[in-house]
Swiss-Prot record:
The keyword Repeat does not apply. The chain crosses the membrane at residues 164-184. It comes from Bos taurus (Bovine). CDD domains: FN3. Residues 41-163 are extracellular. GO terms for cellular component: endoplasmic reticulum; extracellular region; extracellular space; plasma membrane. This is Fibronectin type III domain-containing protein 4. GO terms for biological process: negative regulation of inflammatory response; response to transforming growth factor beta. The keyword Mitochondrion does not apply.
Length: 230
């Protein structure tokens, strides 16, 4: 039973000492053990806390949780340095390991701390992370950090194409070229067939008779006038 008394429960026991005449040793021992179990069930602090995707008015904070611990949520404390802007983001019933920070002031310094939420409460705050938002005209993130702060990871807005993406683009272009070539070939075949099916027009004159007169034409007779004298 003495093993149930953790070191951080000494203060609690000391605070209950004035009431010891009214409390039995068994009650004091149960209270101390319960406090020790509550502290033991709290999850550990997050690790590998980083800030990425820096923009003028937003950023993304991510972290990891040690394996073998039950975590049901997180709590993020955001503080703007040299100005108002404190915010606490809390979410439970989630297993996410990242959170977007929005509504930030451009070209300003911020610090964030992440806590894990377990079944018996929150963990101690994780390491304090410092980052600086970009200016409105900046495209590349500035990786400014104070001594002792965790280095902020910045990502470029324009990333190079991956090998798989290049292969897909080349395949699509080749397919389009093949379709266009097949269409042109079919068009030439159809055009040749149409030209072969049309009868050739040959100029034929009217048939001539052996005497050089057109056949099938009647020779016009000159009018004859008969005069009868009485």
């Amino acid at each position: 039973m003495p093993g149930c008394l953790p070191a951080d429960s000494v203060g609690t026991m000391a605070s209950l000492m004035p009431l010891s005449p009214y409390l039995s040793p068994t009650v004091l021992l149960l209270v101390s053990c319960d406090l020790g179990f509550v502290r033991a069930d709290r999850p550990p602090s997050p690790v590998n806390v980083t800030v990425t995707h820096l923009r003028a008015n937003s950023a993304t904070v991510s972290w990891d949780v040690p394996e073998g611990n039950i975590v049901i949520g997180y709590s993020i404390s955001q503080q703007r340095q040299n100005g108002p802007g404190q915010r606490v983001i809390r979410e439970v019933n989630t297993t996410t390991r990242a959170c977007a920070l929005w509504g930030l002031a451009e070209d300003s310094d911020y610090t964030v701390q992440v806590r894990s939420i377990g079944l018996r409460g929150e963990s101690p705050p994780g390491p304090r992370v410092h980052f600086r938002t970009l200016k409105g005209s900046d495209r590349l993130p500035s990786n400014s950090s104070s001594p002792g702060d965790i280095t902020v990871e910045g990502l470029d807005g324009e990333r190079p194409l991956q090998t798989g993406e290049v292969v897909i683009i080349v395949v699509v272009l080749l397919m389009w070229a093949a379709v266009i070539g097949l269409f042109c070939r079919q068009y030439d075949i159809i055009k040749d067939n149409d030209s072969n099916n049309n009868p050739k027009e040959k100029g034929k004159g009217p048939e001539q008779s052996p005497q050089g007169r057109p056949v099938g034409t009647r020779q016009k007779k000159s009018p004859s006038i008969n005069t009868i004298d009485v």
